[in-house]
Amino acid sequence: FDRAERGIELGYDADGRERGIALKNAVDDDAIFDVTAAISAVAAAGPVTVVGFCWGGSLAWRAATCLTGLAGAVSYYGGELPSKAGLISHCPVLAHFGERDKGIPMDGVNAFIKAQADADPAVEAHIYDADHGFNCDARGQYDAAAADLAWQRTLAFLERVRGTFS
């Protein structure tokens, strides 16, 4: 959200969510330019991966399908992924979804997984018995078991696509 409002920090209450949606809508498509700038800023240090949560998870998917030069992308509960099913990624992608996430219906997630399996085998997706935001311990939806498993899968994925991750 920094493109719209520098240094913004939002809570997970109704006001924070409402403000976050407004900021996302103000920035939306232009956010990929910020991702591109961030990638360029660190590219000389070695292979670059992007990891995003919620809208950031959608941006990670956009980066994987729109940009070249990434070693990999990880999306945690990216709400846009089902509507972008069938796109081909330019790098390996790991996607995490919560089965109880009311904002990302399972029929869309399952359609995304099937479309990607048919079109793009570089995409690996996992569904957890959890809600949206299951990885964030500051939220009521935090699910330690799902978060731990998703994080272990993320670290293994990062090692696979980048080499040793520390």
Can you say where each PLM-predicted feature lies in the sequence?
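N-terminal cap/leader regions of alpha/beta-hydrolase-fold enzymes
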Residues: F1-S166
